[in-house]
């Protein structure tokens, strides 16, 4: 049950220190190792800005557990993602008394009341109400309290407060105790700058799940719970693409498959399909199970290697070009990564950017869309390592749809259902 997970996480948050009696001493190791030890020099920073990981051995009444806590894993990136998912798309602040609509979008109860206006008097005809994000009709009677989200908002706030404590970052002793969250920085401010500077593609070896605290999967599980439930829009699919009956997977149709009629919304050169759900506000995320390796960039007519599978996943604006050659870059209203030749590329302009350290590409890719901030970020769907992030100067300005491209008749791209 998720309440049991919540209890475990709250205990972890409160476990600031280990008392001297009945506990073993903490062991502090210099951050010069390979796996699980973060160093500034390993990310291109100066050797003098080395970080030290704190490893605490906690001996309980019935069992003994190791908690290896590496500061970057508990740093600003994780808390930022939690806060993004705990932010109301209408007011931009943390959810207050969140309510859930029939379309699965959540808002503050007061924010939604202001948007919809005062309910009509008894006996008068009610004006239609719709979701501010997706536009789907949502009657007032469909509102229900989102208790789970309210709990996750509180957890996000507690994590932020915990990391804001000076001792949690500097790793100084306080009253004979050693904080178990954070690292010993030399100097601490340099390491915080390093965190901000390196929110770019990172090596998987520096963000290994083996080095996370035992309760860290609880936080990751909550992030996965908020994944949007998507389907594909067959009306936008290239005529050579085959959409599954449940509209959750797409692959290149085998030869001889009857092609559907063309239409104004359908891609005619790029082997792509859009999601049926579009977003004009708020923060949304979805996961895609990818093919084995793979270039959709050759929609311009370049030859492709028949032995390779090719795919791209990401997001596209409503204005993306459907006919002719499509510009696969932010200037063409496309924010995507491409799997090709056993490597992963960010589709940037004028040339794609090879994402070093991402070999082979992850089997699951998580797309995080923050409409107001103009940010589209990509994560490993299992470890939540950041792969790449596109950043616009402001809000994206139009409805954004999930984008799926594939040139592979063998392995489909599949939307991972929410809660899986």
Curated annotation (Swiss-Prot):
The reaction(s) catalysed by this protein are: S-ubiquitinyl-[E2 ubiquitin-conjugating enzyme]-L-cysteine + [acceptor protein]-L-lysine = [E2 ubiquitin-conjugating enzyme]-L-cysteine + N(6)-ubiquitinyl-[acceptor protein]-L-lysine
What role does it play? Plays an inhibitory role in anti-RNA viral innate immunity by targeting the adapter DDX3X and promoting its 'Lys-48'-linked polyubiquitination. Alternatively, enhances the cGAS-STING pathway activation by promoting 'Lys-63'-linked ubiquitination of STING1, facilitating the STING1-TBK1 complex formation and STING1 activation. (Microbial infection) Plays a positive role in human immunodeficiency virus (HIV-1) replication.
Q: Which UniProt keywords apply?
A: Cytoplasm, Metal-binding, Transferase, Zinc, Zinc-finger
Single GO cellular component term: cytoplasm
User: What InterPro entries does its record include?
Assistant: B30.2/SPRY (IPR001870), B30.2/SPRY_sf (IPR043136), Butyrophylin_SPRY (IPR003879), ConA-like_dom_sf (IPR013320), PRY (IPR006574), SPRY_dom (IPR003877), TRIM/RBCC (IPR050143), Znf-RING_euk (IPR027370)
Which residues form the RING-type zinc fingers? 88-135
Which positions fall inside the B30.2/SPRY domain?
210-420
- Coiled-coil region: none
Determine if Nucleotide-binding is one of this entry's keywords: no
Q: What is this protein called?
A: RING finger protein 39
What is one process in the GO biological process aspect for this record? negative regulation of cytoplasmic pattern recognition receptor signaling pathway
Q: What is its EC number?
A: 2.3.2.27
Q: What mutagenesis or variant effect is reported for residue 108 to S?
A: Complete loss of E3 ligase activity
Q: Which SMART domains match?
A: PRY (SM00589), RING (SM00184), SPRY (SM00449)
Q: Which Gene3D superfamilies match?
A: 2.60.120.920, Zinc/RING finger domain, C3HC4 (zinc finger)
From which organism does this entry originate?
Homo sapiens (Human)
Lineage start: Eukaryota, Metazoa, Chordata, Craniata, Vertebrata
Q: In which tissues is it expressed?
A: Expressed in testis.
Pathway assigned in UniProt: Protein modification; protein ubiquitination
| GO molecular function terms listed in the Swiss-Prot or TrEMBL record | ubiquitin protein ligase activity; zinc ion binding
């Amino acid at each position: 049950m998720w309440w049991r997970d919540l209890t475990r996480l709250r205990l972890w948050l409160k476990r600031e220190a280990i008392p001297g009696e009945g506990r073993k001493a903490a062991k502090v190791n210099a951050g010069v190792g390979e796996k699980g030890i973060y160093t500034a020099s390993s990310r291109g920073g100066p050797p003098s800005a080395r970080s030290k990981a704190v490893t605490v051995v906690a001996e309980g009444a019935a069992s003994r557990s190791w908690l290896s806590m590496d500061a970057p894993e508990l740093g600003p990136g994780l808390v930022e993602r939690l806060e993004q998912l705990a932010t109301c798309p209408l007011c931009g602040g943390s959810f207050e008394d969140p309510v859930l609509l029939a379309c699965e979008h959540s808002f503050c109860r007061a924010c939604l009341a202001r948007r919809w206006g005062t309910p009509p008097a008894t006996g008068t005809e009610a004006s239609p109400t719709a979701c501010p994000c997706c536009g789907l009709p949502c009657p007032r009677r469909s509102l229900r309290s989102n208790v789970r989200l309210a709990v996750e908002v509180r957890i996000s706030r507690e994590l932020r407060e915990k990391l804001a404590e000076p001792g949690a970052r500097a790793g100084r002793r306080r009253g004979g105790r050693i904080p178990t969250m954070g690292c010993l920085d030399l100097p601490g401010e340099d390491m915080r700058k390093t965190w901000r500077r390196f929110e770019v593609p990172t090596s998987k070896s520096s963000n290994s799940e083996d080095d996370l605290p035992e309760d860290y999967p609880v936080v990751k599980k909550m992030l996965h719970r908020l994944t949007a439930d998507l389907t594909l829009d067959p009306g936008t699919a290239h005529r050579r693409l085959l959409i599954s009956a449940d509209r959750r997977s797409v692959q290149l149709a085998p030869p001889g498959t009857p092609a559907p009629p063309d239409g104004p919304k359908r891609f005619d050169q790029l082997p792509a399909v859009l999601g049926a759900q579009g977003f004009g506000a708020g923060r949304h995320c979805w996961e895609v199970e990818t093919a084995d390796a793979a270039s959709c960039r050759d929609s311009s007519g370049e030859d492709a290697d028949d032995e390779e599978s090719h795919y791209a996943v990401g997001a596209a604006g409503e204005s993306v070009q459907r006919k002719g050659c499509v510009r696969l870059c932010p200037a063409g209203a496309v924010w995507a990564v491409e799997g090709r030749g056993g490597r992963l590329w960010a589709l940037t302009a004028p040339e794609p950017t090879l994402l070093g350290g991402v070999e082979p590409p992850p089997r699951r890719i998580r797309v995080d869309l923050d409409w107001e901030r103009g940010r589209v970020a990509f994560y490993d769907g299992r470890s939540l390592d950041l792969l790449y992030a596109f950043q616009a100067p402001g809000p994206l300005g139009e409805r954004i749809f999930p984008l799926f491209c594939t040139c592979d008749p063998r392995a489909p791209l599949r939307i991972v259902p929410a809660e899986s």
